[in-house]
Amino acid sequence: MNVIAIMNHMGVYFKEEPIRELHRALERLDFRIVYPNDRDDLLKLIENNSRLCGVIFDWDKYNLELCEEISKMNEYMPLYAFANTYSTLDVSLNDLRMQVRFFEYALGAAEDIANKIKQNTDEYIDTILPPLTKALFKYVREGKYTFCTPGHMGGTAFQKSPVGSIFYDFFGSNTMKSDISISVSELGSLLDHSGPHKEAEEYIARVFNAERSYMVTNGTSTANKIVGMYSAPAGSTVLIDRNCHKSLTHLMMMSDITPIYFRPTRNAYGILGGIPQSEFQHATIAKRVKETPNATWPVHAVITNSTYDGLLYNTDFIKKTLDVKSIHFDSAWVPYTNFSPIYEGKCGMSGGRVEGKVIYETQSTHKLLAAFSQASMIHVKGDVNEETFNEAYMMHTTTSPHYGIVASTETAAAMMKGNAGERLIDGSIERSIKFRKEIKRLKGESDGWFFDVWQPEHIDGPECWPLRSDSAWHGFKNIDNEHMYLDPIKVTLLTPGMKKDGTMDDFGIPASIVAKYLDEHGIVVEKTGPYNLLFLFSIGIDKTKALSLLRALTDFKRAFDLNLRVKNMLPSLYREDPEFYENMRIQDLAQNIHKLIEHHNLPDLMFRAFEVLPSMVMTPYAAFQKELHGQTEEVYLEEMVGRVNANMILPYPPGVPLVMPGEMITEESRPVLEFLQMLCEIGAHYPGFETDIHGAYRQADGRYTVKVLKEENNK
C-alpha cells in the first residue's frame, strides 16, 4: 500500500516547486505518485484503487468539501492539505475528526513532510488492520524459529522436494509462513477465545451488531451444528425449516431430537418460497406437536433466511411471534445484510434484544463477502451460558485451525466496517439493478425470444422488493403481505418454456442447456432450475464480469437461433457421448428435453411433491443408529414406497432434503418418488444431464438404488 495522489493544479511557482520536491522525497521512500486530472478523477481513483493511502491537495482550491466527499468513501484515508501563510483555516472541532493534516508551502521542507506522511501511512495501515490479522502479520515478519507444528515449518519442508517446491511457488511465502501452530501464545487461542482471537471476535461482534460472535473454520455447516447442539438437547423438540441445509439434517442424525417441520411454499419455476406466517402461530405449532409422536413444546427453531433464491423474511414478525426460547436464522447466503438500510428488519441481528429469547445468526462469510472458503461466523443476541456453548463450539472445531481462514474472516469484517462497507454493498446492489434493467431492455429489443428476470415489472432504486398477494410476477399462491422480500443481489434469469402460473409453452429452452453453454465460456452459474438460472452479484462482481455475462447470454441466443450443432456449441457435452450427439442440433436438444419435462407435467408434479411430506416413522437420529448397526439394504428407487429411508435424499439443485432419514414414502406422498424418477429419466435419455441426487446411487444398468431399513427394523 504505497500510492499517494497529488492534486497539483496550482499554476504558481511557490506552490508547485514545494510539491515537486515532495514528489521526489516520497519516491525515495518507495511511494508511487499519481496525479488525478480533477476532483471527479480523484474520487474515481479512490473507488477503484484500494491501495491509495493518502491524498495531497491545495486547501485554498478544494477546502472541506473534498475532505467530506473522501471521508464518505473512506473515513480513515489520510488527507494532506497544503496552505500558504494567508490561507483561511475555517475548521471546526468536528471537521478535525477527519484525517486531515496541514502543511505549509515551503521550499526545503520536503524530507520532513515525506517522513511525516510515511509515519501517517503506517498509522493508517495500523488503524484499518483488525487485531488478529495485525498480530499475525507481525509474527510472520519477525521470522521466529519454531520447533512445533506444522511440519512444513513455514514452507521450508516443501522446498526440499521438487513437487513440494512447485507447490510452494504456487501458493507463495506468506501463505506458508502464516500457517502456524496454536503453540504460538502471542496470538491467543481460537478455542479458548483468548488474546488477539478474543479481540477479533469482539471486533466482529461490533461490526455485525451482535452481542457475541464466533469465528468458525469449517463452514456454516459446522456453525449450524454448534448452535443446534447447544440449543436443542437430546429429547427435545425442534422446529426446522423443511428447506433446511443438509447440515441441519446431519444435526438431527447426531442428536436425538424430534423435528417438527415448517412447510415452505414453492412456485412453478421450482423457486423456493418462504414459510407462511400461519406456520409461526402458536395454534399451528400446538396442532403439530399434538400430531407428532413423542413431541413436546419446541425449545428451538431454525429458519433459512434468506432462501437459496434470495427471499428474505420480515424477521421482526418471526422474532415477536414464534413462541420458542431460541431462534436460529441460517443466513449462510446473506452475510452482508447489516450493511445496507434496505435489509433493516430482514435479518437476525437487526434491531435490539428480544425479551426472553436468544437470536442466533449463522453466516457463510466466504460465500458473498471476501474471505477464504470455509470461513463462517456465529452471531448471538441474548443470554447464553458461554461455558456450555463453548463446549459445543470446541466439539466441532479443530485444534489446528488454519490461521489464514481465521484472519480472512476477521478481515472480511474489517472491510465491511464503516462507510467503506456500505459503499461495497451499495455497489453490488447498483450493479445488480443495472444488470436487471439491461436484461429487460434486451428482451424488449430482441427478435423472438430472450431471457427474462424474475422480479416485479417495474424496478427503480435500491430496495428489497416485497412479494404481495395482488402481484403475479412471483408465482406464489396465497402469499402473506409484508412477509417476504426479494434481495436485488440474487438475480434469477428465466428461460422460455414456462409461464408464471406454471402453464407450459410449446417452445422451451431448459436452463441446464444455457448453464452448460455459459460454463463452456468460463461463466459458472450458482444454481440451475428447470427454466431458471441464479446469479449472485457479490462484492467481487465488477462491471467487467457483468458485461461478460451479458455478452455470453446474447451469444447464446445468436448461436441457438442459428441452430448450430451440439458438438460445435457444447463441445464438453458432445464428449460425454459423441455417437449420441453427432448430428444433433441445439434446437432439437432443447425441444426434446422440454417435451420430456412437459410430458411429466413438471409444475404440477413439483407442487404435489413438496405439498405432502413423507411420513415420519422414526427420527433421523434413530434411523442413522440403525444404519450404523448395519440394519439397512438397498432397493431400486421405484421400490421405496412403503419402506423407511435410511439416508436423506436431496437433488442438486436446489440441495435441500426431499426425503429425511426415518421417513417413508406412502401412496399419499408418491409424487415425491415421481419427481425423483423424472429427474433420473432426463439423465437416462440425455447423457450429461444427469441430476446429482444425494442418497440415490446410479448402478451400471442406469437404474438408481436407495438405502432403506430392513423390514424387521421398521419399528
Q: At which residue positions do the language-model features occur?
A:
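Non-catalytic terminal extensions of PLP-dependent enzymes
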Residues: H9-D30, N37-F57, L64, I70-M77, ...
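Conserved PLP-enzyme active-site core in the AAT-like
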Residues: P36-L45, D58, E65-E68, Y76, ...
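A short, charged/proline- and glycine-enriched loop
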Residues: M1-I4, S50, A210-E211, A234-G235, ...
